[in-house]
Amino acid sequence: MRGTAMVKRILQYLSLCIVLVSLFILAGCSSNSASSQSKGPEGEWIAYSGYTVQNVVSAVDTPIFILNVKARNDSKTIYTADMKAYNYQYTTPEKRPVIESTQMVGDIKEARLNYITALTLVMSANDIVGNADSSNSNTIKMDITGIPNTALIYDSKTDTIKFMDQTFKRVNETNNLQTLADAYKKDLQVASNKYLEEIGNAANPKTKFITTYNFDDSIIKDNKK
């Protein structure tokens, strides 16, 4: 009898284990299903496409763009977007762009340059209205007068947005204004130093540029207040 009772207990225990395993599997499946569902275009997004020697030569900056997309109705056919752009106002103490500052050096073998620059809000637009495409809800046609190809396209596979030739990713702890500003600073220094080296090597006599960079990111702290 004892042996029979023990067998029953073992079978009951095994049955309980099977039930628990089944529940865990179902929970996992539902979790994976939920995580694989499209999050949609709503939320805060950020984009930065890099700063190269060509930016230095052309004196054209590459801003960091922040985009905030909101649905304005339950059916999510109407959206509004707020957009901001930041870049470093890259000037010398004489308020000259880097490409012009080299022309002020003259024929010397060593030149010291000190660039003091601040991250600056250069563009802000609020409540840009857009309507979802009736055939593709992930495409939102933004109403921006005078600018063609302003469709905001959400890619559910990569959870990114394409808008105005920029690829936006969601803002998070590792992808935000501060982290991209840090990347911008590194790119700016590398590109500028490379350009100055090329200019210096082409000079007669050759000129070595010794450059100091000072960046002011106080606008980021001010935004957090």
Give the ranges of each region predicted by the language model.
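A composition-driven surface/loop motif
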Residues: 78, 131-133, 138-144, 152-154
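Edge beta-strand at a domain terminus
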Residues: 99-113, 127, 146-150, 156-225
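Short hydrophobic/aromatic-rich beta-strand segments that constitute the beta-sheet cores
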Residues: 47, 76-85, 142, 161-164
